[in-house]
């Protein structure tokens, strides 16, 4: 099988040297992602496209799906690459490929040609289109808005029969821009802003301020691992967790109620800037949107920015919440965000929307900054690839099984869309569907006399959720890995 990777248009307008660098980086990213599925595949770069060739037909859908999630790719074409002799040979091959698709439909033929031939692209379009119209009685030519467009590409003595076109996410290849550190909370905003910077070519590291204990960190790890695994797995990134409960405690004890929200955000920026400096990261990324909450007015954002020289990027600054939620739904983080608790908003009852710098600084003089230095120094830094491995260690008390007993029920915890696309069926065994984001509220409603075997496709989510349920006191859970 063969895929043709078409570049994001902004790459094609770069200077020759920059364009070549971007294409080289994108080629490497594609190799890094796809080697997990097929180590024998070939990735070949050209001036205006990249070819991916693989032998294992069983991996076709997996490879195609992975390609559509790599930043820098505008769209991919799944093609059948065959030799041809003349225009009539092109027509005959097109007839075999497209006959079933054109039955009872309107169609047109569109051809791209490169190389030396005694015919033009329009000649091929007319010849093939006329032939298909004659040989498929129920089909009809329609040049504007047809039901089916027959795409053909002629390259020297090769004919590319395009079997399907699939849109990519666009943007720049990861690694073409410098690294950033995303302040991730697991909510709608931080997940989307992280995705937007990945799509723009940045390697995104994650910094999490833990305000809610182990369960909160597990949830945010899930989001960060999901984003990395889905859109950024071509590169290694860090996940830095900072226990911010001592900082919140100091703020609650010593800071005036109205100033708490702004001062908490200033402390977060201070801490994140120290982490960014430690690892040579150029900018911070936040999910703040103008006017969304009290700390996100222009006055307050300016005061928050003042505590650090590090550049702070806010890709969602002009977005409304509905737009952000729609983007979260598109990239797959909506379900995580809906069940993620929001801790920042509960610490201040009457937050100021227009903080005064002198008042903020006066309040901060009461704060013991050694606490902030200590939590940053003790921050837990892990390679995001180790999150799954650490989960295995953390869930060591949760048994992993590969078969089922008479009292066992398999619990499919994938999202609803995944369950509908690939329903899980195990002969002779009950399978119950309960998406992972409903486990915290709905698992207790299940029959607790049964043993529940949590299952997801790759096993990461099931282990994380098993740990969470064990922490909640449910001992009748295991991880199912057939």
Curated annotation (Swiss-Prot):
It is found in: Cytoplasm. The active site is at residue 456. It is an enzyme of class 2 (transferase). InterPro entries: Rhodanese-like_dom, Rhodanese-like_dom_sf, Rossmann-like_a/b/a_fold, ThiI_AANH, ThiI_fer, ThiI_N, THII_Thiazole_biosynth_dom, THUMP_dom. Keywords: ATP-binding, Cytoplasm, Disulfide bond, Nucleotide-binding, Redox-active center, RNA-binding, Thiamine biosynthesis, Transferase, tRNA-binding. Residues 404-482 form the Rhodanese domain. Its EC number is 2.8.1.4. GO terms for biological process: thiamine biosynthetic process; thiamine diphosphate biosynthetic process; thiazole biosynthetic process; tRNA 4-thiouridine biosynthesis. ATP binds at residues 183-184, 265, 287, 296. Disulfide bonds join 344-456. GO terms for cellular component: cytosol. Catalyzes the ATP-dependent transfer of a sulfur to tRNA to produce 4-thiouridine in position 8 of tRNAs, which functions as a near-UV photosensor. Also catalyzes the transfer of sulfur to the sulfur carrier protein ThiS, forming ThiS-thiocarboxylate. This is a step in the synthesis of thiazole, in the thiamine biosynthesis pathway. The sulfur is donated as persulfide by IscS. This is tRNA sulfurtransferase. It comes from Shigella dysenteriae serotype 1 (strain Sd197). The lineage of its organism: Bacteria, Pseudomonadati, Pseudomonadota, Gammaproteobacteria, Enterobacterales.
């Amino acid at each position: 099988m063969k895929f043709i990777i078409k570049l994001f248009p902004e790459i094609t307008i770069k200077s020759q040297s920059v364009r070549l660098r971007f294409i080289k980086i994108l080629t490497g990213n594609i190799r890094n992602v796809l080697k997990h599925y097929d180590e024998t595949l070939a990735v070949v770069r050209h001036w205006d496209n990249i070819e991916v060739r693989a032998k294992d037909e069983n991996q076709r859908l997996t490879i195609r799906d992975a390609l559509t999630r790599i930043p820098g790719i505008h769209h991919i074409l799944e093609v059948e690459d065959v030799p041809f002799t003349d225009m009539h040979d092109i027509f005959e091959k097109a007839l075999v490929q497209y006959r079933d698709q054109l039955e009872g439909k309107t169609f047109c033929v569109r051809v791209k040609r490169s190389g030396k031939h005694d015919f033009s692209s329009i000649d091929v379009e007319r010849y093939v289109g006329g032939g298909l119209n004659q040989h498929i009685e129920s089909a009809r030519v329609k040049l504007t808005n047809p039901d089916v467009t027959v795409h053909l590409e002629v390259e020297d003595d090769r004919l590319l029969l395009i079997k399907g076109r699939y849109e990519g996410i666009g943007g720049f290849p990861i690694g073409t821009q410098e690294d950033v550190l995303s302040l991730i909370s697991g909510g709608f905003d931080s997940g989307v802003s992280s995705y937007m910077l990945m799509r723009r070519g940045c390697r995104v590291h994650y910094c999490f301020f833990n305000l809610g204990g182990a369960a909160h960190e597990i949830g945010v790890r899930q989001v960060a691992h999901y984003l990395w695994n889905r859109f950024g797995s071509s590169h290694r990134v860090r996940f830095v967790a900072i226990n911010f409960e001592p900082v919140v405690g100091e703020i609650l004890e010593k800071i005036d109620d109205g100033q708490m929200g702004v001062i908490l955000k200033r402390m977060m920026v201070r801490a994140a800037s120290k982490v960014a400096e430690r690892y040579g990261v150029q900018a911070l990324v936040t999910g703040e949107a103008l006017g969304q909450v009290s700390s996100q007015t222009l006055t307050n954002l300016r005061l928050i920015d003042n505590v650090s020289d590090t550049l702070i990027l806010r890709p969602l600054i002009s977005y409304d919440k509905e737009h952000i939620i729609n983007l979260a739904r598109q990239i797959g983080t909506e379900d995580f965000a809906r069940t993620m608790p929001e801790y920042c908003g509960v610490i201040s009852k009457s937050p100021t929307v227009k903080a005064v710098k002198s008042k903020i600084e006066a309040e901060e003089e009461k704060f013991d900054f050694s606490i902030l230095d200590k939590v940053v120094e003790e921050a837990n830094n892990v390679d995001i690839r180790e999150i799954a491995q650490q989960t295995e260690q953390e869930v060591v008390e949760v048994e992993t099984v590969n078969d089922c007993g008479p009292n066992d029920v398999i619990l499919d915890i994938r999202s609803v869309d995944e369950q509908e696309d690939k329903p899980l069926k195990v002969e002779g065994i009950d399978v119950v569907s309960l998406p992972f984001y409903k486990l915290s509220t709905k698992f207790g409603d299940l029959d607790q006399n049964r043993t529940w075997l949590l299952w997801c496709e790759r096993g990461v989510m099931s282990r994380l959720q098993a740990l969470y349920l064990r922490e909640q006191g449910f001992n009748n859970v295991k991880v199912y890995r057939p």
